[in-house]
């Protein structure tokens, strides 16, 4: 066992002495040591229940003959960090989480890992760390939050964000915003729609790193405790079989994950996180071109908030991710191995879809192609990303004058000051991985526009958008403005065309004019220190997954 590095032989007497101080006895040194990476925190709703849930994981490990060792890593709530400097730390936190898992696992020679993430950056961060360590690993995602209820309708965090815009437009009162605020998020779990956290949980299950139905089991359901217990037992089987992430995270597994992402209409942030996870695995290549290729042949078959009114609970009841996989048929490589030690095909053999209004059949899709589209053009030569499945048909093609802003704060102020008109194309730049730094999400401006019912407006940014965003919002523009990307050359009044169906984004400027403008402009100075200063120097472009190099 790998843990023999710290527990076997006379030279490891000092190590055993320290382990005895932790409560171990003679019989424990022959058992596998399992690290549990818990991301419990009291300020993130998706993580507040993990302190209790981890105890069921430990019980499963002990029952199967292992020794659990819990350690912790950080978790940032994107909702709470939204629209202020805190959001600059969200994406960079992914790298800290990955490094924490890697450091703890290698520093203590764990034989296996159980990962317990829930929210946006924690899931990919933990997967990246586990891929580096490459010991048997299983993931227990925390589970989605139940939807809130307001006036007989489902409500979630995006309902609250959009209510702020509605109040600004005089459509509802401040008191009504307060009532929505109180009921939209009823308890523990990752926000109830198909936002980034739940999308990444679905990706994790599809990759084969968590047990079937893990992604959609409600956070507060007793079934989630059983899922945690069974995962604890299963990690011992994985250690005995020496089934590692490198055996599971194949090219076919990543293709499957992107396929399910497209079918669900998942968060555009997967175009950052899936490539970043793949970057940690040998002989696997995931690019925006692969997303584009799969998007063109996989239909969008689920309409979950923010694209529609269904919730993750509805998806679970209809068949969960196994039901989506079963529906996709030969678009999925069912030979991929999973943490059950069985193939994906064996896992879903007896699954049935119980509600075809939630998981549509392939012959009756919501859209004929995938929920995410990759756009290219002279604004984004290396690509940009849009959550196509959450764009209404009448907004698939836009052409209008640019209004240019050099920060999220500037555009948000302009929207609330009612300076944005229908037909405008808002350009938000210097918000990329280097330029922000940290590639902030632009949920406040998009939610404000939605709440004000200003519909015929496009948004383009080298930052990113929340998984809760809907509408013609194009993010991840690469190269970013801080890296001399063409988005930095756009000026107020330039005519921009967005054609989502044809994967095209362009400004009516010649290459020569773009080059001249870029040569004569100065990037704004960003006064950053600490971790963000380091991050801005080593982070790569969004089209690489914003990896560090």
Swiss-Prot record:
Record flagged with keyword DNA damage: no
Sites where N6-carboxylysine occurs are at 121
What Pfam families would the database entry show? ILV_EDD_C, ILVD_EDD_N
Q: Where does [2Fe-2S] cluster bind?
A: 119, 191
Task: Name the domain of life this protein comes from.
Answer: Archaea
- Name the active site residues: 466 (proton acceptor)
Q: Its pathway?
A: Amino-acid biosynthesis; L-isoleucine biosynthesis; L-isoleucine from 2-oxobutanoate: step 3/4; Amino-acid biosynthesis; L-valine biosynthesis; L-valine from pyruvate: step 3/4
EC? 4.2.1.9
- Please provide the record's keywords in A-Z order: 2Fe-2S, Amino-acid biosynthesis, Branched-chain amino acid biosynthesis, Iron, Iron-sulfur, Lyase, Magnesium, Metal-binding
Name the GO cellular-component terms: cytosol
Q: Where does Mg(2+) bind?
A: 78, 120-121, 441
What InterPro entries does this protein's entry cite? Dihydro-acid_dehy_C, DihydroxyA_deHydtase, DiOHA_6PGluconate_deHydtase_CS, ILV_EDD_C, ILV_EDD_N, IlvD/EDD_N
Record's keyword annotation contains Magnesium: yes
GO terms under biological process: isoleucine biosynthetic process; L-valine biosynthetic process
The cofactor note from the UniProt entry for this protein is:
Binds 1 [2Fe-2S] cluster per subunit. This cluster acts as a Lewis acid cofactor.
| GO-annotated molecular function | 2 iron, 2 sulfur cluster binding; dihydroxy-acid dehydratase activity; magnesium ion binding
What reaction gets catalysed by this protein? Answer: (2R)-2,3-dihydroxy-3-methylbutanoate = 3-methyl-2-oxobutanoate + H2O; (2R,3R)-2,3-dihydroxy-3-methylpentanoate = (S)-3-methyl-2-oxopentanoate + H2O
Q: Which family does it belong to?
A: Belongs to the IlvD/Edd family.
Complex formation: Homodimer.
The record's annotation in PANTHER family points to: D-XYLONATE DEHYDRATASE, D-XYLONATE DEHYDRATASE YAGF-RELATED
- Give the function comment from the record: Functions in the biosynthesis of branched-chain amino acids. Catalyzes the dehydration of (2R,3R)-2,3-dihydroxy-3-methylpentanoate (2,3-dihydroxy-3-methylvalerate) into 2-oxo-3-methylpentanoate (2-oxo-3-methylvalerate) and of (2R)-2,3-dihydroxy-3-methylbutanoate (2,3-dihydroxyisovalerate) into 2-oxo-3-methylbutanoate (2-oxoisovalerate), the penultimate precursor to L-isoleucine and L-valine, respectively.
What name does the UniProt record give this protein?
Dihydroxy-acid dehydratase
Gene (name only): ilvD
């Amino acid at each position: 066992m790998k843990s023999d590095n710290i527990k076997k032989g006379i030279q490891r007497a000092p190590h055993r002495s320290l382990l005895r101080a932790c409560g171990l006895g003679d019989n424990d040194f022959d058992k596998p040591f399992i690290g549990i990476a818990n991301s419990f925190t009291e300020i993130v709703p998706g993580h507040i229940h993990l302190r209790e849930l981890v105890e069921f994981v430990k019980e499963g490990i002990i029952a199967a003959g292992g020794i659990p060792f819990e350690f912790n890593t950080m978790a940032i709530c994107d909702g709470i960090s939204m629209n202020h400097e805190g959001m600059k730390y969200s994406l960079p936190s992914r790298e800290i989480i990955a490094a924490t898992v890697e450091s703890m696992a290698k520093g203590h020679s764990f034989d296996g890992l159980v990962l317990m993430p829930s929210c946006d950056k924690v899931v990919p961060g933990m997967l990246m760390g586990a891929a580096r360590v490459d010991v048997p690993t299983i993931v227990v995602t925390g589970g989605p939050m139940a939807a809130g209820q307001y006036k007989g309708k489902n409500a979630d965090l995006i309902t609250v964000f959009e209510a702020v815009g509605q109040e600004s437009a005089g459509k509802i009162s401040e008191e009504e915003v307060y009532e929505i605020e109180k009921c939209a998020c009823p308890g523990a779990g990752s926000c109830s729609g198909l936002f980034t956290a739940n999308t990444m949980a679905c990706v994790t299950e599809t990759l084969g790193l968590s047990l079937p139905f893990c992604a959609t089991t409600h956070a507060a359901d007793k079934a989630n405790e059983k899922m945690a217990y069974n995962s604890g037992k299963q990690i011992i089987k994985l250690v005995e079989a020496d089934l590692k992430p490198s055996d599971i995270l194949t090219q076919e597994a990543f293709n499957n994950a992107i396929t399910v992402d497209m079918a669900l209409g998942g968060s555009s942030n997967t175009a950052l996180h899936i490539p970043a996870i793949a970057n940690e695995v040998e002989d696997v290549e995931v690019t925006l071109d692969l997303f584009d290729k799969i998007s063109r042949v996989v239909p969008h078959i689920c309409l979950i908030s923010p694209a529609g009114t269904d919730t993750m609970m509805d998806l679970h009841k209809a068949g969960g991710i196994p039901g989506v996989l079963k529906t996709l048929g030969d678009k999925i490589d069912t030979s991929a191995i999973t943490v059950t030690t069985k193939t994906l095909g064996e896992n879903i053999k007896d699954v049935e879809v119980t509600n075809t209004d939630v998981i549509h059949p392939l012959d009756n899709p919501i859209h004929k192609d995938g929920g995410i589209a990759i756009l290219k053009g002279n604004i984004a030569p290396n690509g940009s990303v849009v959550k196509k499945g959450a764009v209404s048909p009448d907004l698939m093609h836009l052409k209008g004058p640019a209004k240019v802003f050099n920060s999220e704060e500037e555009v948000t102020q302009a929207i609330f000051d009612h300076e944005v008109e229908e037909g405008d194309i808002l350009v938000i730049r210097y918000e990329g991985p280097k330029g922000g730094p940290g590639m902030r999400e632009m949920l406040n401006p998009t939610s404000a526009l939605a709440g004000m019912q200003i519909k015929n407006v496009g948004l383009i940014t080298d930052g990113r958008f929340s998984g809760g965003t809907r509408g013609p919002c194009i993010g991840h523009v690469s190269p970013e403005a801080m890296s001399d990307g063409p988005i930095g050359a756009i000026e107020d009044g330039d005519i921009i065309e967005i054609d989502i169906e044809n994967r095209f984004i362009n400004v009516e400027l010649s290459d020569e004019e773009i080059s001249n403008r870029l040569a004569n402009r100065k990037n704004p100075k960003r006064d950053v220190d600490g971790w963000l200063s380091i991050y801005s120097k080593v982070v790569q472009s969004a089209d690489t997954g914003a990896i560090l190099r």
